Amino acid sequence: MELERKSSGIIKSFNVLDIFSINLLYMGILSGISYPLFVSSLMKNVNLLFAIVIGAVFEIPLLLMYYKLTTKFPLNGGDYAYIRTAFSSKFYTIFGISLWLTYVLSQPILGDLVLLNFNIQNQFEQFLIVESLFPLVLLIIASKRIYAKIVDILAIFQIIIAIFIAFKSFNYQYQTFTISNTLLSALLFDLSAFIFINAISYIAGEIKNIKKSSMIGYFVSYGVVAILSILDSYSNLNILFALMPIWFFSYMPIANKIQSRLIQTMSFDKVLPEKFSKINPNVLLLIFSTETIANVLENLLGFNISFGLDGLLFIFWNFIIVAFAYLKLMNDKKLFSIVLTSLAIQIFLFFYLGYQNPIFYKFVIAGNIEYTILRIMILPIIGAIVYLLRKSKINVIPK
């Protein structure tokens, strides 16, 4: 929904169904589990029931943390808004730019996963297909009426299809398994579905009845995704793989909506120029331009990183840093410790078990190490440059 500044503040335009749909689509059901199921089938010796349950349990502390932050600070901008409230202008500027670019750089990577599922490996074809989706998605987020209808329809559609698939082809069979492979599968479900829980925090200032909507948006959508993921994991896998593009197309409007609110909020804070303070062609053109640059770098020039390492960077910029903001804002040491412990366990298992498993390494970790290091370094450097330009030359960012 379009953000408008009025004398009374932000217009509350998101209802309960919108919030439920947005978070559900961000996680995905059919497609969010397709890639984990594909890799798990190659690893073998995976108990899918245990993997999904473990994966879902891993992220419950994050879910609770975001629910508390969203209801306590119903501000647009999500993670950036919490960091801005807790820390200095220098830090929140660097963080905001780095977070935004993390979203920009992730979209071609996720698009490539979908295309590889259809054996489209030509770099130029990948570039063209991913690029063709950008303007379509931006047109969707430009209209609040169209956006609301599409996210609600896509969410309901995914639920209906997921139930139908489970009803027609559910076939539970006990699976012999190893603990290590099942844990790796759990991490895949996290990286593909269960860590994508914080979309509604970026539009919190536009939510009607914030507590009720957040409860349903966070916990009910999470429960629906977890339950249907279990049911569909024991159903017709070929159908699930064929439906994987649904998730990418569902994810893109949500991720671009997040970018628009992030850009807009940074513009309000003078981190970015004021011309981006409204959702208008300027914002849409900025999103399109940066995503096109990312698409060129990753699909034409080959400067890409692996799906798994991209997910870990997402965890760092979205969750680990925000956990410290949560501690400062809420003084809740218990939940803070649980969140960091859960994330630390996942990161440890990712590297310790992942490097030992050739299938997991090939499909999740292997990638351009040099570019990965460069990407880790360059995002905060760009953020620091933006801070210096806006503060020293334009002198608009407060100290």
Curated annotation (Swiss-Prot):
The keyword Transmembrane applies. It comes from the Viruses. InterPro entries: APC_superfamily (IPR050367). It is found in: Host membrane. GO terms for biological process: amino acid transport. The chain crosses the membrane at residues 19-39, 46-66, 91-111, 123-143, 146-166, 183-203, 225-247, 283-303, 307-327, 335-355, 369-389. It is a multi-pass membrane protein. Its main location: host cell. Keywords: Amino-acid transport, Host membrane, Membrane, Transmembrane, Transmembrane helix, Transport. GO terms for cellular component: host cell membrane; membrane. Putative amino acid transporter. This is Uncharacterized protein 399. The lineage of its organism: Viruses, Adnaviria, Zilligvirae, Taleaviricota, Tokiviricetes.
